[in-house]
UniProtKB/Swiss-Prot annotation:
This is Serine/threonine-protein kinase Nek10. Belongs to the protein kinase superfamily. NEK Ser/Thr protein kinase family. NIMA subfamily. Residues 1-16 have a biased composition (Basic and acidic residues). Residues 481-514 form a coiled coil. Expressed in the mammary gland, lung, spleen, and kidney. The gene is Nek10. One of its GO terms (molecular function) is metal ion binding. It comes from the Eukaryota. It comes from Mus musculus (Mouse). ATP binds at residues 525-533, 548. Residues 519-791 form the Protein kinase domain. Residues 1-24, 47-72 are annotated as: Disordered.
């Protein structure tokens, strides 16, 4: 049995080897323990040659980077350092040290590492950098075991570790880092992440102040350090107490920068951290302040599920603020969320967690991770369902704003969301049910808006619809929708199929419902007393329009066919007049009227928005009310529309109600529904009984003649309803209602909410006597002070927009001219170069001065690249200067600028300590030759003699003597007394640029510093992709000169306006002694002079001038 004998021997050898290894490991651990227990004062450093132990000293820990290369291959390491290195190699994969056979030894080693090394100041101060790094690595490995994390706390090591991390971080962020600085920070951030992963231990971290250092490391330049800080902060932010402390620091600005500019992994971790922090109100406010909404919405184009999930939950939290909710809609966030819900995108994801990423980062394996792993279909489905639930949550919060809710419906959102309520038996039941709850909640919020309710009546069967209604308006609790989901899932297959068909019926992207004339009917928008309104599109066009269908059999048009035909004729005639005459921003445009099948169709402008009546109902259900500013904004626009109709067009609307007043974006008012409008002659009265009785004036109810003041009465009713959310005259008994209207009896507006001007205006408009009731001009005069404030804001906004448009126009023109000039210059250079060569060759063969020209020709031939490239640089500067100063481009002006620039360059060269080099001489010489070649040879030779007479040293060469003689014959004598020292303009520009860059390289501040942020944004605009060297020179030059010209606003954000307001009580600049910028100035932005002032203030605060004077 030779094989069995061989196997037995092999087994014995293996057992002996394992036994030997265990014994050796035990011996190594004991030796390390003994070394660590040696007091720092008795420790001997160094002891062994590093090269001899290099084979045993690892490269398996990639985190140990050779920050400084070994000096000539010789470097001595202490015995302890070698043992620590061996320890990190042998136990790099061990995680449960407390269950290891040598647990006691490990615990003693850990205790010694903390007591005798980490918290021993004497040892820390004298230990080599690589030695302390190895101590940190061993601590990191041991602290994978939770038992050792508690021991570290008991020994008081957390505070010392936090202090050391702060010291290293300050050196690192101050660009004075020592060896292994990055590796130390990576290991320490890992340790704090492990501590923060346990809920009860997070308080230890914040008590040590480590969270402040972690926040400052968000400005780190190395990815591993940044990721370590993000991972540790994300673990800390799981606790509400820690979140509160982190939110007190300047964290949002750096997080938004990472989300905007960094790699996918950094963005993913940052989004997760920001999601956790957004539970704090001040974090949400900072996201708004630092204009984070566009950055967050730009990330919705990503295909990574985890990144998208985190970003959407950030949006859910920040859109609780009404202004942020509106901003999300303006930036197209609603469309993007609905696009994600449609499910026609291919997503990717991965299985990594905070813990696994932290371990990979500390071990140097972070770059090897795949952030787009091939997940199973089940995992992808699970992540996608979570993402869809997040989208529904975001749309729910956005739907609290009526305009947002209307856009969701307009973008086919009800159909997209309703599809998610259908059961999906292939997915995880718990997750599918949760998604159904989120979808039902979004639909219920949309249903709360009255105009959307007819849509939902078509969706659900009666029993399910009753449960849907009983939940109530705007109920956020997701648990309230579980019974509704259970009831839906218990329906029979046929009933579910019917619901699915109902959902398909509300799809706005299906084929048109029908065609009326040349118009395709796309959707039913609403119904009124005289007909319906549809959204339509012309067969041959793309523009959306509104079409009102009026049923001519309505009794209001007459009792018999003859009366109806007469009424229709008059209405069509009046509408034709209106169509041709009305051009006002607050009055709807009419395009066409036609008859078809006993129905009158009126084609008009489609107003995006909701009727004022729906806003009343929505605010009442939310228990909110109009602010007085918003109330006046709407009423003033209504007055402007009525003044235009009454006084300029002599048109009485006759049916002015909240449902005929559309509110668009930013509460823009549009008066609609002129189907009952009547154009009257001067001083004539109308007698027909039309309109809505709730808003009808007394003279209409008494069948007396009436005029334009009937609309004033209706306007007063609408103003009253804006203040109380209820009409002034309301009763179920028609006789009682008519009596109240005739006598003008209504409940007074509650006191304390609005000013007396509101109640006075209502009282005057609701005067029962038509003769005593004011017309619309008199009403406007009553609120003249309010209208003047409104007009002032409009004028300010218009002026700011006009100036911004003018700056954009000039900048576009400047860039266009520069691009064309550069193209022309390039072609001109090539043409002149060939012409010069030809002229020189011709002159050298025919002129008596051949020797001199030969020397020049051979000199330029020595460096062909230099002779071509450098003049182009000078020419570029000349072109840029012309473009930026917006001079004309005539030849004389160009030569004048060229002489001026040449004088500056020559002055600079004379002021230098050494003589000008030949490239400068050749550059200016070549420019002169090109510039004067078009003006004549005489001028060319004069300029050449002038250059030579300045004493510029020629390039050494065989023809040098000829050129020197020529130079000497054309010299210029200048008295020494008249020579003055000049200031180098380039040096002044560099000094200013140095100041800007110095400020942006200061260590990040823990608290908000708006001045530094403004300077940082200014620096980014200087070096952005849209900038160029010419623009950089011009901007810095204006800054150094303190130009009063405003800086282009492409880099300023709302935080700068906060800075302006915070400084309103102080002097801003020498030219602004009041120091109180108006709102107009804030809109205009900052001048170079003001930016210079801010820069100098920050330099003073940072001690810049103290350092420079000592230097």
């Amino acid at each position: 049995m030779p094989d069995q004998d061989t196997k037995a021997k092999s087994t014995e050898k293996t057992a002996d080897k394992q036994q030997g290894t265990t014994t050796r490991d035990y011996s190594d651990l004991k030796r390390l323990r003994c070394l660590l227990n040696v007091q720092s004062s008795k420790q001997q450093l160094p002891a062994i040659n590093f090269d001899s132990a290099q084979n045993n000293m690892t490269k398996s820990e990639p985190t140990i980077r050779t920050g400084g290369h070994r000096a000539r291959g010789q470097w001595h390491e202490s015995t302890e350092a070698v043992e620590l290195e061996n320890f990190s190699i042998n136990y790099k994969n061990e995680r449960n040290f407390s269950k290891h056979p040598q647990h006691q030894l490990f615990q003693e080693i850990f205790t010694a590492l903390v007591r005798n090394r980490l918290i021993c100041r004497e040892w820390v101060n004298r230990a080599p950098s690589i030695h302390f790094l190895r101590v940190l690595i061993c601590l990191r490995l041991l602290m994978r075991d939770p038992c050792y994390q508690e021991i570290l706390h008991k020994l008081g090591g957390i505070e010392d570790l936090a202090q050391y991390m702060e010291i290293v971080a300050n050196e690192y962020l101050g660009y004075a880092e020592e060896q292994h600085c990055v590796d130390k920070l990576v290991n320490m951030t890992y340790i704090f992440q492990k501590l923060a992963a346990v809920k009860d231990q997070r308080e230890w971290v914040t008590a040590s102040g480590a969270h402040k250092t972690l926040v400052s490391l968000l400005g780190a330049r190395d990815t591993t350090v940044l990721l370590g800080a993000l991972l540790a902060l994300a673990s800390l932010a799981e606790s509400s107490e820690c979140r509160e402390k982190i939110s007190e620091l300047n964290v949002v600005e750096n997080l938004l920068m990472i989300l905007h500019e960094y790699d996918l992994l950094s963005k993913r971790l940052t989004a997760e951290l920001l999601r956790l922090l957004c539970a704090e109100p001040q974090i949400k406010e900072q996201v708004k302040l630092y204009e984070g909404i566009p950055i967050l919405l730009s990330l919705l184009h990503s295909d990574h599920l985890k990144l998208l999930w985190s970003v959407i939950w950030i949006l859910v939290q920040v859109c609780e603020d009404p202004e942020t909710s509106v901003e999300i809609r303006i930036w197209g966030g609603i469309k993007q969320l609905l696009h994600i819900l449609q499910g026609d995108r291919n997503f990717v994801s991965d299985r990594s967690s905070i813990g696994s990423l932290s371990s990979a980062n500390a071990a140097g394996r972070i770059q090897q991770l795949h952030l787009s792993e091939d997940l199973s279909p089940g995992e992808i489905e699970e992540n996608t369902v979570s993402l869809q639930a997040a989208c529904c949550a975001a749309l729910t919060e956005l739907a609290l704003n009526d305009t947002n809710a209307h856009q969701v419906v307009q973008e086919n959102g009800v159909y997209t969301i309703a599809k998610l309520i259908l059961p999906n038996k292939q997915s995880n039941a718990a997750q599918t049910n949760l998604l159904q709850c989120y979808a039902f909640r979004t639909l219920r919020f949309l249903f709360s808006m009255e105009r959307n309710r007819p849509l939902f009546k078509r969706l659900f069967p009666t029993d399910l619809f009753e449960t849907f209604i009983d939940i109530g308006h705007y109920v956020r609790d997701i648990g309230a929708y579980k019974d509704l989901v259970s009831q839906l899932n218990l329906l029979l297959e046929d009933e579910l199929k019917q619901i699915a068909e109902n959902i398909e019926s509300i799809n706005q992207k299906k084929a048109p419902l029908k065609y009326i004339g040349d118009y395709a009917v796309l959707d039913h928008l609403g119904s009124g007393a005289f007909g319906c309104v549809y959204k339509v599109r012309k067969r041959s066009g793309q523009n959306l329009l509104a079409m009102k269908e009026v049923n001519l059999h309505n009794p209001a048009f007459g009792k018999d066919k003859k009366d109806r035909d007469s009424s229709v004729k008059n209405i069509v005639s009046e509408l034709t007049i209106i169509k041709e005459q009305l051009y006002h921003p607050n009055v709807v445009r009419y395009y066409k009227t036609f008859l078809e099948n006993d129905r009158l169709y009126i084609v008009m402008e489609l107003i995006e928005g909701a009727p004022l009546g729906e806003h009343f109902n929505s605010l009442k259900e939310k228990h909110h009310h109009f602010s007085e500013e918003r109330l006046w904004k709407i009423f003033i626009q209504l007055c402007l529309a009525l003044r235009y109709l009454h006084k300029e067009k002599r048109i009485v609307h006759r049916d002015l109600t909240p449902n005929n007043i559309m509110l668009g974006d930013k509460d823009k008012v549009t008066v609609t529904d002129f189907g009952l409008a009547k154009q009257k002659q001067e001083s004539s009265k109308l007698t027909s009984m039309v309109g809505t009785i709730l808003y009808s004036c007394p003279e209409v109810l008494k069948s007396e003649p009436y005029g334009e003041k009937a609309d004033v009465w209706a306007a007063g009713c609408i103003l009253y309803q804006m203040a109380t959310l209820s009409p002034p005259f309301c009763s179920t008994n028609m006789l009682s209602l008519a009596t109240k209207i005739v006598e003008a009896v209504y409940e007074p507006v509650p006191e304390g909410i609005y000013s007396e001007k509101v109640t006075d205006t209502i009282r005057r408009c609701l005067t029962p006597d038509a003769e005593a009731r004011p017309d619309i001009v008199e009403v406007s005069s009553m609120i003249s002070d309010v209208m003047m404030k409104y007009l002032d804001r409009l004028s300010t906004s218009q002026l700011a927009l006009e100036r911004k448009l003018e700056r954009e126009r000039r900048r576009t023109q400047r860039y266009f001219m520069e691009a064309n000039r550069n193209a022309v210059t390039c072609h001109h250079e090539l043409a002149l170069l060939s012409q010069e060569t030809f002229e020189k060759a011709s002159l050298s063969s025919s002129s008596s001065g051949a020797a001199s020209l030969k020397s020049e020709l051979s000199e330029s031939a020595e460096l062909p690249g230099e002779g071509c490239h450098i003049p182009c640089g000078k020419e570029e500067d000349r072109v840029c200067e012309e473009v930026l100063s917006e001079d004309n481009f005539q030849l004389e002006s160009v030569e004048k600028d060229l002489y001026s620039e040449l004088d500056d360059e020559l002055d600079v060269s004379d002021n230098c300590s050494s003589s000008s080099s030949s490239p400068l001489k050749e550059s200016t010489f070549s420019i002169l030759k090109r510039s004067f070649s078009a003006s004549g040879r005489e001028r060319h030779s004069q300029a050449r003699d002038f250059i030579a007479g300045l004493g510029s040293r020629p390039r050494p060469g065989p023809q040098m003597s000829t050129f020197v003689v020529e130079s000497a014959s054309a010299g210029i004598a200048v008295s020494q007394r008249k020579v003055r020292q000049i200031c180098d303009p380039i040096q002044q520009i560099l000094i200013q640029l140095h100041k800007v860059i110095y400020i942006t390289q200061l260590p990040p501040a823990l608290h908000h510093d708006l001045k530094r942020r403004v300077i940082e944004r200014f620096k980014k605009s200087l070096f952005s992709q849209q900038s160029n060297p010419c623009n950089l020179k011009s901007e810095i030059k204006k800054l150094s000169q303190g130009s009063p010209e405003p800086i282009e606003l492409n880099f300023l954000t709302s935080d700068y306006h906060s800075l302006r307001h915070s400084r309103a009580a102080n002097n801003w600049s020498p030219s602004d002694p009041t120091g109180s910028p108006s709102s107009f100035e804030v809109e205009e932005g900052v001048t170079y002079e003001q930016m210079q002032t801010v820069i100098e203030e920050v330099l003073e605060e940072s001690g810049y001038y103290n350092f420079t004077t000592k230097r």
